Every structure is written in structure tokens, then in C-alpha cells.
UniProtKB/Swiss-Prot annotation:
Species of origin: Irkut virus
Complexes and interactors: Homomultimer. Interacts with nucleoprotein and with the cytoplasmic domain of glycoprotein.
Family from the record: Belongs to the lyssavirus matrix protein family.
Protein name: Matrix protein
Keyword Endoplasmic reticulum recorded: no
Keywords: Host membrane, Host-virus interaction, Membrane, Phosphoprotein, Viral budding, Viral budding via the host ESCRT complexes, Viral envelope protein, Viral matrix protein, Viral release from host cell, Virion
Amino acid sequence: MNIIRKIVKSCKDEEEHKPNPVSAPPDDDDLWLPPPEYVPLAEITGKKNMRNFCINGEVKVCSPNGYSFRILRHILKSFEGVYSGNRRMIGLVKVVIGLAQSGAPVPEGMNWVYKIRRTLVFQWAESSGPLDGEELEYSQEITWDDDSEFVGLQIRVSARQCHIQGRLWCINMNSRACQLWADMSLKTQQSNEDKNTSLLLE
């Protein structure tokens, strides 16, 4: 039975036998697409709960036999239950994970590493989101394992409020990031003040 659980194996290169070369992730998806909802197309009008965050995010995928996004989606569908970080930051973490894995990975031994370093504009609904000035340092490994396959997902996200101007992006609702956000049950609602943005409810 396939189960999601916290660390059961470590993603190390020191294996007793040399694994088969990892195959490249599928390239039939868009490579790097910006967030479709959380960075506005135009100037945000409702500035009350808007905050710029300087983000460093890394998602490292360890799999001796290669992996597919089907497996990653399977892992992330249980993200709500295994997330060990600050609950007030979970929406931000979900956005960063989706964006990172929408990018092009860099091979690192038997791992594939996705990184993102951006200034992102986030807007939370009233009473949601981090406290003013709150920072996040989050690190976790989630694994999926059965008799035939092993995939380890190492996630690291650091976020702090900053005053650097966030960039304006285009919306693409068909991005891989949107698919992963749906898998992680990202909770949002459209802003009443700005049709180009959605509010994070978590």
C-alpha cells in the first residue's frame, strides 16, 4: 500500500551500488511560469494586507530510478497532513513549492534540484497569514516508497518581509504551478478590491 510519511530513507549519494542514471523530468510542461494569482497584473489597490516577501525556496527530488510528476503530485496531495512548519505560513510555502517545481531543475548527483529566489507580493484575507514582521525558516523531507519505487522530496523555504519592489507578471492558469497548488489544496478567494489578485486564506 502506498503511503506518505516523514523521513524513512535519506537522499544521499553514498549508495552501496551505483544506481542507474536518473532520467530527466518530463519536459512537456511549461518550464517556469510566474504565479497566476498572487502577483498582480496591475497595481494592487487593496494595500491593507499586502506584503512583499524575499523568498529563497529549494525543492530537491531524490529518486534512484527517475521520477514523474505523477509521483510528486501524489506526495503533495498529502501535504496538509505532513507539513511541519509555521501554520500561518503554509499558504506562502505552497505557492513557493509550486513555483519552484515549475522551473528547470539542476542535476546534483542522483538528485534534481529546483530553486527559486524572488521577491513575491502576497495578499492575505483579514486575520490570515503571518504576523507582521514574522519570518520563516522551514525544512522538511517527505518520502513516498513502495516495493518498486522510492522518491524523496526535500523542501526548504526561507521567507522574510522586505521592501524591494515585487515584479509584475502575466497570468497563465494552465501552469504546472496551478496544478500543484490544486493538489496541495491551496485556499484562496478573489479579492473584492482588485480583480487581478486573489487573497490567501491560509
